Amino acid sequence: MYKGIFLCVLLAVICANSLATPSSDADEDNDEVERYVRGWASKIGQTLGKIAKVGLKELIQPKREAMLRSAEAQGKRPWIL
């Protein structure tokens, strides 16, 4: 009787132990996909950041040539040298 209980408990421990450890194949696949996505996301973010910087500079800073020409057309001395 004790022999049957012991074998049942031993089988339960072995099954629980093997289920608790993750397989390495699944982790490698997830890491590879995660690295791939993370790499593309950072590159896209950097590109969008550069585009935004250039766009904001163009909007905020007026063109010097246009300011010089408009000042000359009005007969004023341009303040930009």
From Swiss-Prot:
Reported tissue expression: XPF is synthesized in the stomach and stored in a novel granular multinucleated cell in the gastric mucosa, it is stored as active, processed peptides in large granules within the granular gland secretions of the skin.
Keyword Ribonucleoprotein: no
Keywords: Antibiotic, Antimicrobial, Cleavage on pair of basic residues, Secreted, Signal, Vasoactive
Subcellular location: Secreted
Record carries keyword Cell division: no
GO biological process terms held by the UniProt record: antimicrobial peptide biosynthetic process; blood vessel diameter maintenance; defense response to bacterium; innate immune response
GO CC annotation, single: extracellular region
Proregion positions: 21-37, 65-73
Top-level lineage group: Eukaryota
Signal peptide per UniProt: 1-20
Task performed by this protein: Xenopsin is a neurotensin-like octapeptide.
Family (UniProt): Belongs to the gastrin/cholecystokinin family. Magainin subfamily.
Protein name (Swiss-Prot/TrEMBL): Xenopsin peptides
The organism of origin for this protein: Xenopus laevis (African clawed frog)
